Every structure is written in structure tokens, then in C-alpha cells.
Swiss-Prot record:
Homodimer. It comes from Haemophilus influenzae (strain 86-028NP). The gene is hisC1. This is Histidinol-phosphate aminotransferase 1. PANTHER family: HISTIDINOL-PHOSPHATE AMINOTRANSFERASE, HISTIDINOL-PHOSPHATE AMINOTRANSFERASE-RELATED. InterPro entries: Aminotrans_II_pyridoxalP_BS, Aminotransferase_I/II_large, HisP_aminotrans, PyrdxlP-dep_Trfase, PyrdxlP-dep_Trfase_major, PyrdxlP-dep_Trfase_small. Belongs to the class-II pyridoxal-phosphate-dependent aminotransferase family. Histidinol-phosphate aminotransferase subfamily. One of its GO terms (molecular function) is histidinol-phosphate transaminase activity. PROSITE patterns: AA_TRANSFER_CLASS_2. GO terms for biological process: L-histidine biosynthetic process.
Length: 352
């Protein structure tokens, strides 16, 4: 008997999530993980590191509640958005009995988190224009306890129609939790569904400081939901999820002056996105640039593998989507600095 055979059967069969960092590469320009291109500068207080952190750092809870326009009772701080995903699955799904439902092409961690927990997965692909297929979702809700949707959707970049999310909430009422992943909402804040929280107790929203706040290394995310749902999740979350240094920096990031800085830098990035989209459209290798409301662009190439490989060899690391459902020959490009965007365009232009 080996150590592997002692592990759970579903773990033995598990294909782990291939994060951008795990895929690696020897890059000088990293545009594969939807990270912000520059790092903010904060100072750690360095105090109380000998003490365990608060179960929920109250200054961070209050600061995020103020930022999001909700009560502190609506906020749970997590180790990145991914812990929020895992937490909801562990809390609401019975292993080998219940299922989650997700709509590919979308973020891969929904399925991986369910598989790790021994929970079944159902997938209802998005429509050709990357919107929810509500009739098919309705037909597949048996045994589903959690439905995950992502808006703006990763990797396609588009927003889901709010009217469709509203319909989804109505058909799942009393049956399942609906999780709307808003990791990229700072790039289109007017599209948030946060105003629906008060009327739909089965709605949970995933947020993060990893994208527009440029703090991916901090691992700080949030679940926003009604107080009853937050209380249930609080029973399951680890006792000390947020390290003191992470809480310290998160609280600084959520101060009004820094939020104003984030909003200004976001506008600069959106300008870079617009420039990049226009520049890519005229390249002979690029067949389509999909509309995006996030900090990345999805492009379809004549030969996506050739483009990806050519840039990889030059140290420009993008995210290959060729094996993703309905995204053959597609590449996802994180919007970087203007200089990085220019180098991407020049490199693709040279691909034969």
C-alpha cells in the first residue's frame, strides 16, 4: 500500500487547477494571471505578531462594508475569493449527494473545489454569446445546492445580463444558493448585483482585493450575503483565516484615499485595454477580439498555439485557452502597462 492509495479515491483521480503561477514560464512580461501590473506601497505596522489574529478582522470588515455599501453583518473576510468558493461548497453540499452547477467557459476553481470536496458537478455551457442558458439551467437543478456564475466572466470578459441573474435567483429560490463571482467588478462597478442582496437571501457575492486593488499576494477576499448566510459560513471557516499582516495591509487598501487612487488607476488601465483592443484588431493573426469589461482581453487567433508559443519563447507569458470549452485558438491577455501592451502587439505582429 502506498501513501497515494491511502488518500480518498476522488483525490487520487483529481486533476488540480492549473493556476497561472503553477504553469510557470521564464517571463519578463507576465500577462497570464489578471494581476495588476504594478504593486501598491504600504507599510506594515509590525505589531502584535506574537498574537493570533482576530477570527474576523473587524477593521477590515468595517472598511469593506463601508466600501461596498452594506452592513458589517453582510461581510465575511476570506483567504482570497477561492476560500469563499470552497467554504460555500463545504457548507451547503453533502458529499456524493449534492451538486454544484456552473456555466463554462468560466473560472475553473468552481469544479475543482467541488471535486476536492467530493461534491458532484453539473455544467450548463453558456450560449454562443456567453450568456446564461436559463432553460437548460432550470432543467438541471435537481440535487443542485449551489449555482456559480461569474460576471464579468473569466476568461471571456463579458458581463452576464442582470435580468438573467435575476431570473436565476427566482428559479433557485428555496432550492439553491446562487453565487455571483464579482472578482473583476471594480472595472465595471455599475454592473454589481449587490443591490439584490436585500431581496434574495440565497444570493452570495464573491469579491477580492487581488485584481483592481493590486493585492493578489495578500490573499484577501470577501463573501457578501445576508446575515443568516454569513452566520452559517462563519461556523465552517477556519478560526484564524486572515494573518495580521494581511489584515493590516487590507485595512490600509480600503481607506478612502487609497480607494480613490485605485479608481484613478483603474481608469488608466481601462484606457490601456481600449488601446490594446484596437491595436490587436488590425493584426493578421487575430481573428477576433472579444468585448471585455474586465482587466483582460480574450482574442481568437488563426493559430492560437503558434501565437502563444512564439510569445512564450520571448518571455511574454499569456494564458492559453485552446483546451477550454468553445475557446479553440483563443488566448487571454491581461492588460498591463502601456509599454507591456505595445510589446505584446509588436510580438504578435511578427508571428508568421
Amino acid at each position: 500500500m502506498t501513501i497515494t492509495t491511502l488518500s480518498r479515491q476522488n483525490i487520487q483521480a483529481l486533476t488540480p487547477y492549473q493556476s497561472a503561477r503553477k504553469l510557470g514560464g521564464n517571463g519578463t512580461i507576465w500577462l497570464n494571471a489578471n494581476e495588476y501590473p504594478t504593486s501598491p506601497e504600504f507599510q506594515l505596522s509590525g505589531k502584535d505578531l506574537n498574537r493570533y489574529p482576530e477570527p474576523q478582522p473587524q477593521r477590515v470588515v468595517q472598511a469593506y462594508a463601508n466600501y461596498a455599501g452594506v452592513s458589517t453583518e453582510n461581510v465575511l473576510v476570506t483567504r482570497g475569493g477561492d476560500e469563499g468558493i470552497e467554504l460555500i461548497i463545504h457548507t451547503f453540499c453533502e458529499p456524493k449527494q449534492d451538486a454544484i452547477l456552473f456555466c463554462p467557459p468560466t473560472y475553473g476553481m468552481y469544479a475543482v473545489s467541488a471535486e476536492t470536496a467530493g461534491v458532484l458537478s453539473k455544467s450548463v455551457p453558456l450560449t454562443d454569446d456567453f450568456q446564461l442558458n436559463l432553460p437548460e439551467i432550470k432543467n438541471h437543478l435537481n440535487d443542485v445546492k449551489v449555482v456559480f456564475v461569474c460576471s464579468p466572466n473569466n476568461p471571456t470578459g463579458n458581463l452576464l445580463k442582470q435580468s438573467d441573474i435575476l431570473d436565476l435567483l427566482q428559479i433557485t429560490a428555496g432550492k439553491a444558493i446562487v453565487v455571483v463571482d464579482e472578482a473583476y467588478i471594480e472595472f465595471c462597478p455599475e454592473a454589481s448585483v449587490i443591490n439584490l442582496l436585500k431581496n434574495y437571501p440565497h444570493l452570495a457575492i464573491i469579491r477580492t482585493l487581488s485584481k483592481a486593488f493590486a493585492l493578489a499576494g495578500l490573499r484577501c477576499g470577501f463573501v457578501l450575503a445576508n446575515p443568516e448566510l454569513i452566520d452559517i459560513l462563519s461556523k465552517v471557516i477556519a478560526p484564524y483565516p486572515i494573518p495580521v499582516p494581511s489584515a493590516d495591509l487590507a485595512e490600509q487598501a480600503l481607506r478612502p484615499a487609497n480607494i480613490a487612487t485605485v479608481q484613478a488607476l483603474t481608469q488608466e488601465l481601462l484606457s490601456n485595454r481600449q488601446w490594446l483592443a484596437k491595436a490587436l484588431l488590425v493584426l493578421h493573426q487575430v481573428e477576433k477580439v472579444y468585448e471585455s469589461e474586465a482587466n483582460y482581453l480574450l482574442i481568437k487567433c488563426q493559430n492560437g498555439q503558434a501565437v502563444f508559443k512564439a510569445l512564450w519563447e520571448q518571455g511574454i507569458i499569456l494564458r492559453d485557452q485552446n483546451k477550454t470549452l468553445h475557446l479553440q485558438n483563443c488566448i487571454r491577455i491581461t492588460v498591463g502597462t502601456r509599454n507591456e501592451c505595445e510589446k505584446v502587439v509588436e510580438a504578435i505582429k511578427e508571428v508568421k
